[in-house]
């Protein structure tokens, strides 16, 4: 690739020289992707007629360049020819000399933007590449996020390469399994291939429906314990799967057998920040889709575990604990209750553990997610004791959520020796532009240095990283993924990161969630809709009574509604939606806007960012005189009300708008689509993958207000003139969700992944210890001082 670029410079020096001059003339020291593409488009427009056709190779190079840094006389390019593949080069702006740069040299050049990165300056560099097993690495970017398939191949190949050792490892792995004091799979250590074959022959003489209870004693004498199946037929199937695996290992045989081992009956889910409860919390600061995701996830996982344990003949009650923070001053929520059963589940509880000061006092108030870092190590110790007391043993799987939950999951996994699964939901480094380079500017409010360090530790410690989309891992041809953004970066003056994460690591697995079908279903299923909510929805949308939690009364009720629901923070961009609506007389003439989010009275908010957004919303409504066309409600809606609200908007042939500047996944997008409501959602993040643009919904650029308003208006006009068009998009949205985004599919997939990776963890125990030690050192020497520097408010 470097030589091809060098040839381009030789073949067309005039174009390259002119383009570099064009960049220099803008008097900037750096360009990110969007700015660079705009600069290239401007350059093309300025070229003489007929000349632009010859700059195709240059434009292709620029189209795959994520960043340019000007360090006179050199232009430094971060070139990304494909997802996950990075090449750093610099080109002399006059001589057009081309040099490939090391990652360290690129990061040094980047530090120059903030006046650091001097030649010869001693800088701490952390590099994780040599601590990762090469055997876990994928090769093709099209396979990123499908680590399970790769791992099955590697494990099967490992067993096949030494059948005797492979058989021994599998049988040893089976002998380790116990639940509630009883052996599973094997009752002694004398089981071998011959005894397995003889037992399969014996089972073949029995009726398939023979219950396990009737053959239990015979099986015990043969060396087998519960876990093979609930009937003689299923036991025989499972044993034949093992025989096939031991005789001729293959990826399919390995997955099929391991997927039947009842190795998981207790799960710990960790989600610390925000207000975690089942009612009266959504829309509060730091509290949104993650809470909904985890509650639905826990219910689905419990159903899957219960079904799997029953099929395998194991009489054990599965249990899930959702660990979060206990907040004594709970503001009318249940966040002050230690243990809260989850509605809709049989044995899932929210376990709340408080933050404690060093002297043991309990912190009584809510704390911003950006300021909880000094509390986490003590919290992890307290949580460990509580979990062991509740479960009676260690959990079989720990699932961390967001930066704080993932770090605590790392600490617990390390101490308990349990498989660790991380779910980021959102990585802040991807949400705030140049937040790594300008980390010092964010220290007072966000403490990003501490958070990014925690993310780096947790993502490298995890056995499994679950994402909702490919975008989250590796982006697309033009935009980098959230995780990919942690590959090479710098916190100037603190440390540099090389190979911080490898998006080709098989630990990455895409498992997309869904929406709870009890609450989010098509508007057309009229007989199932909660008609008793009609007065409440009517008041919510069209009520004329004044209140501190609402502003605006819709004057023309005949117009369709543009609906948006989210937290009131900068990234969710509800104020941006209000502004683009206010600016567009065409859109205002076609539809009313309803925004559900935050508080309407700024005095009711305790979060600085939310207060700023509330003030901005009021300014926009005042400036554009929107009180007759925009309805803003500061309500916390439960799922039943939210689901019916989507359907009522669909009844009126409205749309749902998700205008976030960045959205890791977009549960509200799934909820709205599940209700049959056409969706317009940000192209930055998960919705780009969820929605087929123009087919099952529409992508919007939240930074381009005019284009977004026009696209909304175009659809509304087209749907008014041809009602079938609205129905086509609605039906396609319903079909898209049914095909790809359900909790049943999610739970099956995640449990399969957890079992395979649990076996991999057993096989590679020694190989993982080197990385673990490196991460321990990094945590003690780098993260801990940063965490202790955050004030304990």
From Swiss-Prot:
Species this protein is from: Acidithiobacillus caldus (strain ATCC 51756 / DSM 8584 / KU)
Listed EC numbers: 2.4.1.13
GO BP terms in the entry: sucrose metabolic process
Activity's dependence on pH: Optimum pH is 5.5.
InterPro entries assigned to the protein according to its UniProt record, in alphabetical order: Glyco_trans_1 (IPR001296), Sucrose_synth_GT-B1 (IPR000368), Sucrose_synthase_pln/cyn (IPR012820), SUS_EPBD (IPR056736), SUS_N (IPR056735)
Temperature dependence: Optimum temperature is 60 degrees Celsius. Remains stable after 15 minutes at 60 degrees Celsius.
Name listed for the protein in its UniProt record: Sucrose synthase
UniProt entry keywords in alphabetical sequence: Glycosyltransferase, Transferase
């Amino acid at each position: 690739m470097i030589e091809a670029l060098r040839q381009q410079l030789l073949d067309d020096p005039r174009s390259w020289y002119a383009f570099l001059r064009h960049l220099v003339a803008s008097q900037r020291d750096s360009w990110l992707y969007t700015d660079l593409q705009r600069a290239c488009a401007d350059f093309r427009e300025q070229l003489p007629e007929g000349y632009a056709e010859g700059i195709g190779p240059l434009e292709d190079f620029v189209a795959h360049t994520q960043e340019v840094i000007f360090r006179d006389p050199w232009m430094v390019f971060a070139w990304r020819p494909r997802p996950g593949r990075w090449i750093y080069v610099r080109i002399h702006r006059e001589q057009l000399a081309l040099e490939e740069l090391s990652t360290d040299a690129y990061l040094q050049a980047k530090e120059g933007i903030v006046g650091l990165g001097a030649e010869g300056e001693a800088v701490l560099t952390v590099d994780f590449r040599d601590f990762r097993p090469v055997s876990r690495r994928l090769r093709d970017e099209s396979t990123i996020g499908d680590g399970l398939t790769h791992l099955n191949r590697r494990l099967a190949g490992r067993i096949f390469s030494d059948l005797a050792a492979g058989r021994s490892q599998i049988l040893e792995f089976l002998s380790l399994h116990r639940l509630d004091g009883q052996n599973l799979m094997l009752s002694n250590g004398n089981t071998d291939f011959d005894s397995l074959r003889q037992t399969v022959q014996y089972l073949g003489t029995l009726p398939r429906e023979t219950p396990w209870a009737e053959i239990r004693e015979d099986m015990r004498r043969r060396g087998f314990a519960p876990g093979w199946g609930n009937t003689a037929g299923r036991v025989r199937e499972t044993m034949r799967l093992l025989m096939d695996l031991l005789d001729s290992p293959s990826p399919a045989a390995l997955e099929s057998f391991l997927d039947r081992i009842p190795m998981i009956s207790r799960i710990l889910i960790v989600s610390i920040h925000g207000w975690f409860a089942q009612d009266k919390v959504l829309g509060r600061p730091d509290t949104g889709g993650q809470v909904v995701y985890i509650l639905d996830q826990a219910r689905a996982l419990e159903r899957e575990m219960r079904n799997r344990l029953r099929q395998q003949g194991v009489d054990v009650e599965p249990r899930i604990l959702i660990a979060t923070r206990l907040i004594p001053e709970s503001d009318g929520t249940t966040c002050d209750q230690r243990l809260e059963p989850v509605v809709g589940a049989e044995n899932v509880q929210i376990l709340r553990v408080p933050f404690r000061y060093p002297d043991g006092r309990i912190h009584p108030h809510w704390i911003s997610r950006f300021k909880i870092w000094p509390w986490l190590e003590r919290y992890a110790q307290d949580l460990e004791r509580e979990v062991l007391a509740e479960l009676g043993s260690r959990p079989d799987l720990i699932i961390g959520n967001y930066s704080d939950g993932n770090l605590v999951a790392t600490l617990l996994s390390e101490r308990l020796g349990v498989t660790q699964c991380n779910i980021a939901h959102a990585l802040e480094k991807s949400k705030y532009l140049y937040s790594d380079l300008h980390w010092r500017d964010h220290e007072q409010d966000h403490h990003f240095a501490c958070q990014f360090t925690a993310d780096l530790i947790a993502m490298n410690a995890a056995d499994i990283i679950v994402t909702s989309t490919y975008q989250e891992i590796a982006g697309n041809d033009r935009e980098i993924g959230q995780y990919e953004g942690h590959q090479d970066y710098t916190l100037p003056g603190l440390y540099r990161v090389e190979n911080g994460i490898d998006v080709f690591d098989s630990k990455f697995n895409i498992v997309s969630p869904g929406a709870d079908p009890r609450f989010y279903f098509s508007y057309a299923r009229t007989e199932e809709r909660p008609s008793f909510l009609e007065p409440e929805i009517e008041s919510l949308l069209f009520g004329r009574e004044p209140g501190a939690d609402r502003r605006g009364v819709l004057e023309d009720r005949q117009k369709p509604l543009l609906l948006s629901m989210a937290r009131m923070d900068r990234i969710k961009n509800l104020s941006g939606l209000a502004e683009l609506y206010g600016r567009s007389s065409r859109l205002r003439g076609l539809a009313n806007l309803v925004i559900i989010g935050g508080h309407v009275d700024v005095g009711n908010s305790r979060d600085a960012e939310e207060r700023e957004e509330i003030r901005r919303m009021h300014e926009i409504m005042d400036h554009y005189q929107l009180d007759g066309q925009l309805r803003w409600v500061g309500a916390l809606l439960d799922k039943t009300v939210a689901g019916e609200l989507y359907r009522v908007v669909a009844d009126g042939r409205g749309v749902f708008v998700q205008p976030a500047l960045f959205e890791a996944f977009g549960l509200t997008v799934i909820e709205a689509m599940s209700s049959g409501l056409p969706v317009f959602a940000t192209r930055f993040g998960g919705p780009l993958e969820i929605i087929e643009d123009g087919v099952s919904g529409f992508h919007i650029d939240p930074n381009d207000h005019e284009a977004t308003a026009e696209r909304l208006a175009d659809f509304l006009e087209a749907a008014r003139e041809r009602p079938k068009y609205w129905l086509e998009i609605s039906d396609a949205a319903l079909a898209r969700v049914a095909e790809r985004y359900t909790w049943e599919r999610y739970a099956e997939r995640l449990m399969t992944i957890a079992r395979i990776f649990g076996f991999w963890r057993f096989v590679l125990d020694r190989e993982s210890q080197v990385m673990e030690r490196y991460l321990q050192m990094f945590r003690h020497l780098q993260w801990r001082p940063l965490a202790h520097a955050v004030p304990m408010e």
